């Protein structure tokens, strides 16, 4: 008597389906599945090494080009 049997769970499921309706429960299931998928994709994206990620080239400074310009101006 202390535990819940399968019949208790079926009655609870039936009451929940009557209260919320099957369409609402289906939407909740779809939203939950999308959230889990998004979380897994985010975790996979976070596991990629930092040096493997492509950094944007805009605003990047080429250090070697600056050094060669300095050495060329000293020769003149």
Curated annotation (Swiss-Prot):
Belongs to the TatA/E family. GO terms for biological process: protein transport by the Tat complex. The Tat system comprises two distinct complexes: a TatABC complex, containing multiple copies of TatA, TatB and TatC subunits, and a separate TatA complex, containing only TatA subunits. Substrates initially bind to the TatABC complex, which probably triggers association of the separate TatA complex to form the active translocon. GO terms for cellular component: TAT protein transport complex. Part of the twin-arginine translocation (Tat) system that transports large folded proteins containing a characteristic twin-arginine motif in their signal peptide across membranes. TatA could form the protein-conducting channel of the Tat system. Residues 40-76 are annotated as: Disordered. Residues 64-76 have a biased composition (Basic and acidic residues). The chain crosses the membrane at residues 1-21. The keyword Signal does not apply. It comes from Burkholderia cenocepacia (strain HI2424). It is a single-pass membrane protein. InterPro entries: TatA/B/E, TatA/E. Coiled coil: none annotated. HAMAP family: TatA_E (MF_00236). It is found in: Cell inner membrane. This is Sec-independent protein translocase protein TatA. Its main location: membrane.
């Amino acid at each position: 008597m202390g535990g819940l049997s399968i019949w208790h769970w079926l009655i609870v499921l039936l009451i929940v389906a009557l209260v919320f309706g099957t369409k609402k429960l289906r939407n909740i299931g779809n939203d939950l599945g999308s959230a889990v998928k998004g979380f897994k994709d985010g975790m996979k994206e976070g596991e990629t090494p930092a040096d493997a990620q492509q950094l944007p080239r805009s605003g990047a400074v080429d250090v070697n080009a600056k050094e060669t310009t300095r050495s060329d101006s000293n020769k003149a």
